[in-house]
């Protein structure tokens, strides 16, 4: 693998980046994203392809998940961050995108993790994600959702 410096290739950097990405996704909450159409007086001036929420999440998380899959701490933190973001979102479709990425993190983490304790920790985090998603269904974002990640 390549990096600008060896310090950028460690799991701690990945986990710190995940914190910031999670904060950014919570900041977006259920805000609309630009549609790429720029008009004036009803006349189309410019159309630019833009990403939707799913594309944004894929861009943010795919490489970290792919390169971090051999580090249980990265997979655990990824699922924890997705759980925290899930608790922010009203939009069930956006939560489904997060669920896909939580499932990928769980599956890939389990595939590359041999220590039983780490495998159990990954499973526990995934179960917490599922509980947070189930709890969010039918609730507005103003209602509290309990997200725990003590260990």
Give the label of every model feature segment:
Residues 1-151:
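Short basic (Lys/Arg) and small-residue
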